[in-house]
Amino acid sequence: MKITSIKSHVLRYELEKELGYSQQYYKHRTAHLVEVQTDEGIIGWGECFGPGNIALANKFIVEKVIQPLVIGEDPLNKEQIWQKVYNLLRDSGQKGMPIQALSGVDIALWDILGKKTNSPLYQLVGGKCNNDVPVYGYGMMLQKKSVDELILLFEEEAKQIKSKNFKAMKMKVGLGPKEDLKLVQAVRNSIGKDFKLSLIHI
C-alpha cells in the first residue's frame, strides 16, 4: 500500500456569541481535518490542532511540506514516516505548527492501520484497559462582560453541566487573579465541594 495524496480540510463556523480565553476573543471556530489517501482506496482521517488562522498555516505545512515527503511511502510504516518528517522539520521547531501538522498526518496513518487490520485503535496501542472512560463537561468560556455578569452565566452553566451526569467539569479563567478567584468561587459554590472542577488558563 502507498500514500497517494494528503489533503487538508479547514472547517469554519460562526459562533452565536463572541467567546474567549486569556489570550483572545473570537467569533468563529475552526477545525482542521487531514485526509490521507492510498492506492488501495483506504482513506485515513486525522485532525490538527490550530485555532483560527493557524489552521490555514497548518494546511500549508501539511500539503506543501509534509505531503511531498511521504507520497509513495507505505502508510503502515507510521514510525518511519514520523521520524523522517520530524527530522526534516525539527530545525523549524520541535513544537508549534510543524508538530501540529505532523500530528494530523500521524493520526490519519493510525486510522489507515485500523481500517486495514479491521481493528479498533485501543487494540493497536496496547489493548483495552478500561470498560468506561470518564468524561467531563466543558464550558464557561470568557465573554466581554463584567465579572458579576460572568458569575451569573458561569453559575447557571455549571449547574447545567452537572445536571447532565458528568463527573467533572472544566472552566476558563484568565481575567486576572482577583477576577478569576471570584469566578471559581462562584462555580464551586454552585456545584458543591465534592464535584471535580478543573481550570484552564489558555
Located regions from the model:
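Structural preference for beta-strand elements that scaffold enzyme active sites
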Residues: 134, 167-170, 194-198
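Metal- or metallocofactor-binding catalytic centers and their adjacent structured scaffolds
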Residues: 37-116
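Glycine-rich, aromatic-flanked loop segments that form ligand/cofactor-binding clefts
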Residues: 106-140
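Alpha/beta enzyme core
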Residues: 152-167
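Conserved small/polar residues in nucleotide/adenosyl-binding loops
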Residues: 200-202
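Structured beta-strand/loop patches that form or line metal/cofactor-binding pockets in enzymes
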Residues: 1-40, 45, 49-51
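Active-site-adjacent beta->alpha loops and helix N-cap segments on the catalytic face
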Residues: 175-187
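Active-site mouth loops of central-metabolism enzymes
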Residues: 134-153
